[in-house]
Amino acid sequence: MNKTITPNPETLDQKWYVIDAADQRLGRLASEVAQILRGKNKPTFTPHMDTGDFVIIVNAEKVVVTGKKSSQKLYRRHSGRPGGMKVETFEKLQARLPERIVEHAVKGMLPKNSLGRKLFTKLKVYTGPTHPHQAQQPETLIVNTIPTGEN
């Protein structure tokens, strides 16, 4: 009979990856990042544990969406007060806080529980090509989110 192996949290190897979001499709990029944060790309994946890696996303202001989503996609937030609903389009939010667009997309693809909140802290999003995590010696990860007609 096979035995179920649970990875030891102390011995897990958590790597750091850098992903360039320039000219990448938002949803496809977010789904790839969510899988890495969750650890689904590793043989040690366990649904109830944090087995994923850290992800740094640079050039968040250059992420793109297809179709008319740049003018029609809405981001909503509420202050909690009566009449406190704020609505912003993709274009306006990208001009104001481009990191929040990528964070919002990835957060929606993580579990909606305490594990998901813990995994979300392992995502670092920056505008521009630089980041302050050189000490962690992150690996560059190439993500191709532009679909081609080849199957």
Curated annotation (Swiss-Prot):
GO terms for cellular component: cytosolic large ribosomal subunit. The keyword Ribosomal protein applies. Keywords: Ribonucleoprotein, Ribosomal protein. GO terms for molecular function: mRNA binding; structural constituent of ribosome. Pfam families: Ribosomal_L13. The keyword Ribonucleoprotein applies. GO terms for biological process: negative regulation of translation; translation. Transmembrane segments: none annotated. It comes from the Bacteria. Gene3D superfamilies: Ribosomal protein L13. InterPro entries: Ribosomal_uL13 (IPR005822), Ribosomal_uL13_bac-type (IPR005823), Ribosomal_uL13_CS (IPR023563), Ribosomal_uL13_sf (IPR036899). This protein is one of the early assembly proteins of the 50S ribosomal subunit, although it is not seen to bind rRNA by itself. It is important during the early stages of 50S assembly. Belongs to the universal ribosomal protein uL13 family. Part of the 50S ribosomal subunit. NCBIfam families: rplM_bact. This is Large ribosomal subunit protein uL13. It comes from Rippkaea orientalis (strain PCC 8801 / RF-1) (Cyanothece sp. (strain PCC 8801)).
